[in-house]
Amino acid sequence: MKKIIFFGLVVSVLGFTPLHTVVGSSHEDCAGVGCLPQEAQNQCTKNFRDGCIDWANGVFYAVGFGVPNTKFKSAAQRNYSAQVAAEQVAMRNLLRLVETTLLDSETTVQDGMLESDRIRTKIKGQIRQVQMVGAPRYMSDGSVNVTMKMQMREVIKVLAEDPRIKAFSAPHEIQAPQALVSTSTAGSSTSTASGVFTGLLIDARGTEISPALSPKVLNEDGDVIYGFADVDRQFSLEQGMMGYLKDPQAARSNERIKDRPFEIKALHSSGKNNADLVISNADGVRLRQMNREQSFLREARVMVVLD
């Protein structure tokens, strides 16, 4: 009874609205991220105790556990109460996962939420609109596990709207290169043209890089080669600055950069949170030249391979 009352307090404080799905419920026991649907487990790049992040597609997943309210007499009512409790816990875990996500190499999303009441209110509002993934899992002891997901772009848009968030500040609108060869409109012919690339693939294995919403690529002198100010706002808000995967071949064939990505090796990570990547000065010079003539950096067509 105390647990149900506690979950009720979560509802009153955060204002969550429960979502309900019963059809096709599972009865297999599980725990933690092991309760995530198989599709989420297959796609996630980073796992945590109560959820995971799919950094390739920009999705947060969180699981929630709920127990039935024993004061209800019917099994249907007890199942319903357990599901509602599980949904609230999943939303709370999702909020915690979002808060602890790196914003850049120095700050987290929670830092941004502390900086602005507006950011905090909007992100919590987005949490209330999250979707359940798959059907609830009913355990053998009557408890329930559910999975909720949230699109990363919803968080990025909220943060980017606030001028106080330096990680998403840009001095000017990004202009298309004069000699632009558009990877998004030129079709398959661009993938075979000499010197024309469809994206950037950075091998960051061994660098201890940590994924972030607004990372940078630096050269050995500390100059920014790629950052939020170098990307068209439409692309950065919709798909983020970079995608991250552990499988090199999966990263190479990812829709974001596939066909003919320019491949480089990162030297090491940088910053307090190890979210920035350092590349050689020679690669930096070549990328800057490409950025003047091609569109893949402006369109955030960047993938990073992790350990």
Residue ranges and their predicted role:
Residues 1-4:
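Positively charged n-region of N-terminal signal peptides that target proteins for export
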Residues 6-7, 21:
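Intrinsically disordered and other compositionally biased segments
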Residues 8-15:
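Bacterial N-terminal signal peptides
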Residues 18-307:
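Domain-level marker for long, solvent-exposed, non-transmembrane regions
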